[in-house]
Amino acid sequence: MKYILSLNITFLCLISTIISAQINITYPTSRAVFQRNNSNQSSIYIAGNYTTFTDKVEARVIARTMTPTQGTTTNWTVIQLNPSNGYYYGTLNVSGGWYDLEVRHWNGTTLLGTASLQRIGVGEVFLIAGQSNATGDSDLKNQGNFGPRANDDRVSVVNYTVNFPTNYGGVVLPRAEFSRLDSTFNIAPFGVSAWCWGALGDTLTKRLNVPIAFFNGGWSGTGSNAWRESANDSTATPFNFFTMPRGMPYGNLRAALHFYVAQFGVRAVLWHQGETDNVQEVNRDTYGNNLKMVITKSREHSGKSNLAWVVSKASRFKGFQIINSRTWQPVIDAQNDVIGINGNTQPNYTTQVFEGPITDGLVGPNIRTSDSIHFVGNGHRILAGVWNQRLNTTFFTNSTPYLPIPPPTLTGDCNGVSNLLITVSNIYSSPNWNNNFTADNNLSTSYSYSASSGNYRVKVKDSNQNILISPQINIPTNFSGLIPIISQNSGTWHDFTTWKCGRIPTSIDFVIISSGQEVIVSSGLTGRFKRLELKGNIRLFNASKLQN
């Protein structure tokens, strides 16, 4: 006796059993802040791994308890149906706020497991640029002048700095791991200390009631000529009191735009620079042209044509041939030209540039150091205060925020019994597979990588050379129940050569019979599965059966 099961019939598990299972969250990471849009919304991309057959993954965010109340808790939302390969990836729309993230996974009506991640934010992301009153200074830091820490839990940075000297082409930034900003922390990629940004972060979180993240691509002591030269030519070595590494100082800003800003989004670049142009006596037209060039290149390189800049008006300097502290009006006039204060017919006027704080008048004891250049003591808080005044409602209403670019998704297919062939789409370029914590070692530069047990990610570039990192995929030693078992040719159920994975299906596997193929369960044997999808045929002989 025999019978044939028709095409396109799907057998589903009829009896649910309680299975001990685990699920984790590998993306995002704790304290990450994602840029919101002007409607107070952003997409959070969520990914992780699970260890048993799953047909649905859900997620929600829970607003952390704070005074005043903040955030909007969401309901459980399906982020992926029928994930495969022990890996899930989905998206959740979230309002501005500071959250704990939860995920859970199901098999039918059976809840298999949950996982949680504390402190995930949707708020405002800023990229700082300029010279030492933007970055802090390593010598001043060693003297104890580093600015106040952030007291609010919601002020996030990546505590990392690019080693000096590094050419632009040699900058490899690590995967972002966020911390609350402490006084002596670096602010990736090249910020030296908290400076005024911890105090500004506290003020903004209190005022806006959303988390704040800072990145810092400035360089102490740099003039606008060096910024223009390196923005225009990534191999240039500008002379700025010394010969700078190739592509610097702009290279650090560009690296941050391509890496951190691509992944987390951005509201604006905050620019504080002009003191060095005072001592160099740069004229108005030159400074304006330099700054306009840097802004234009930042938009061109990042693919963000309306990237907002907030330009502070700064020029005060003392030192070298300048015996007494002075300001330099040509720099201030040029900054006003770029902003548009002198009208939009000025040749260096640039759209989407906003007026920053006027800082030259901030002088006095416990405001600046003896050189009358660098802020110190209460001066950091005063500087933060004037920045806060300029980041006003008009600025947030009229600036164009850029939300994070989705991280690349991964697909997987078994490559023998113990390897998984993981693949990233070829819409990207320069794939770089890695398996270390910082995601900066290089295992392969192919679009697919055959991997054994372990944790893997891939770095890729988009059409604007932005660098994106996939969420981590965990490849277990035993694939049973995680990877669909697919027929690769007609044959018998209990012959491993019938199956693409080279493994006979078991009661925990999702089995697919491919179109145009027929699989035979031999007499007296049982074909076991968890879920069965028929695109081809199954043939049963006497006393043979299927069982789930």
Report residues per predicted region.
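Solvent-exposed segments in extracellular or luminal domains encompassing
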Residues: 442-456, 511-515
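A short beta-strand segment in extracellular, disulfide-stabilized domains
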Residues: 43-47, 416-426
